A protein has these predicted regions:
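Short S/T/G/P-rich N-terminal loop/turn motif that feeds into the first structured element of a domain
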Residues: 1-57, 62-64, 68-81
Length: 81
């Protein structure tokens, strides 16, 4: 399943320079920061929203407010193959 994350970032340097420890079965094919780095959208492929939430919030909750949702793949355009 694909999961979209939306980030409102208070410390862009810390957020964008951090590393995520992705568990097996979780991929991060797209990362899209805003020009000034205070907003961002990421696309994950994983087994559940909860898996992505645990990884992202665990690494960034001190510097970002994060939103998560599973994508309706049947209605989406342009998802990675």
């Amino acid at each position: 399943m694909y999961i979209l994350t939306i980030h409102t970032i208070s410390d862009p340097q810390a957020f964008w320079s951090g590393q995520l420890n992705l568990p097996e079965g979780t991929e991060l094919p797209m990362v899209m920061p805003s020009e000034n780095g205070t907003r961002g959208v990421c696309l994950f492929k994983s087994t559940s929203v909860e898996t992505v939430r645990n990884v992202v919030d665990g690494a960034t909750s001190a510097v970002s407010r994060n939103e998560f949702y599973a994508i309706n793949e049947g209605g989406a355009l342009g998802l990675p193959a």
